[in-house]
């Protein structure tokens, strides 16, 4: 799937994931620093938290990172796809299909009602086909963006991430194959627990095409839509 997507001129593959929550404060992070830093002996209540959410383009070595100060919800994740697409859509005007590599996390798995509803809305709004290609349990390490997170972790190990600005600054100065990421701060507050009724999800489900025998792991949201879609 990934290979065929990368070979097609009108298909763009992205790898997306959220990194572990970063606690902001004078906390020890391990590693070594060229300058002397002092960390607390114990991890007390953090001043804030930031969750890096990344979108990586494997064939172009481009990385976009969004520092989320709220909970990372289904709405948050789809909003990041929208935010990213708005910045690149003119450059990728020839793209008709977006393939998204993801792990099967709680906020973005293919049975998560709000996540799937928002993606259907994205397809309709931007007139682009979306295909979700999930990694099965214990295989998320093969998602390409995980390599980027490893580079970032090594980059800021030994540093004090004692402010949100410090987290963003270290993220901006990391490099992937010599290229710095595009980094944005997102302070929107997201509500948790948003979900559709069974009837509403049934309508969404009618707009999805699931691969037989791999229904949870590969989902196609076509455009133009099937004639059964509501107008």
Question: Language model features by range: what are they?
Answer:
Residues 115-133:
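Two-metal-ion acidic nuclease core segments, chiefly of the RNase H-like superfamily
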Residues 1-38:
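Charge-mixed, compositionally biased segments that are often intrinsically disordered regulatory tracts
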Residues 14-15, 97-104, 132-137, 170-171:
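Extended hydrophobic secondary-structure segments that form protein cores and membrane-embedded regions
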Residues 90, 158-231:
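C-terminal accessory extensions appended to soluble enzyme cores
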Residues 132-154:
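RNase H-like two-metal-ion nuclease catalytic core shared by retroviral integrases
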Residues 11, 93-97, 129:
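A general structural motif
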Residues 38-101, 106:
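Electropositive, glycine- and tryptophan-enriched low-complexity nucleic-acid-binding patches
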Residues 102-115, 136-142:
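Acidic, metal-coordinating catalytic cores used for nucleic-acid/nucleotide bond scission
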């Amino acid at each position: 799937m990934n290979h065929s997507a990368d070979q097609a001129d009108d298909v763009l593959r992205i790898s997306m994931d959220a990194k572990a929550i970063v606690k902001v404060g004078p906390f020890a992070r391990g590693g070594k620093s060229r300058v002397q830093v002092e960390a607390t002996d114990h991890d007390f209540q953090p001043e804030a938290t930031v969750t890096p959410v990344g979108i990586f383009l494997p064939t172009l070595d481009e990385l976009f990172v969004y520092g989320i100060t709220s909970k990372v919800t289904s709405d948050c994740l789809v909003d990041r796809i929208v935010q990213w697409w708005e910045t690149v859509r003119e450059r990728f005007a020839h793209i008709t299909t977006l393939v998204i590599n993801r792990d099967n996390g709680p906020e973005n798995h293919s049975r998560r009602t709000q996540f799937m509803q928002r993606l259907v809305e994205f397809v309709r709004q931007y007139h682009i086909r979306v295909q979700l290609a999930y990694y099965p349990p214990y295989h998320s390490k093969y998602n390409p963006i995980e390599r980027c997170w490893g580079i970032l972790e090594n980059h800021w190990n030994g540093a004090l991430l004692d402010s949100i600005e410090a987290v963003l600054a270290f993220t901006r100065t990391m490099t992937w194959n010599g290229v710095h990421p595009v980094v944005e701060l997102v302070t929107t507050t997201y509500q948790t627990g948003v979900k559709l009724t069974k009837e509403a999800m049934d309508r969404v489900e009618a707009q999805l095409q699931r691969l037989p025998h791999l229904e949870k792991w590969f989902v196609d949201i076509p455009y133009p839509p099937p004639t059964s879609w509501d107008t």
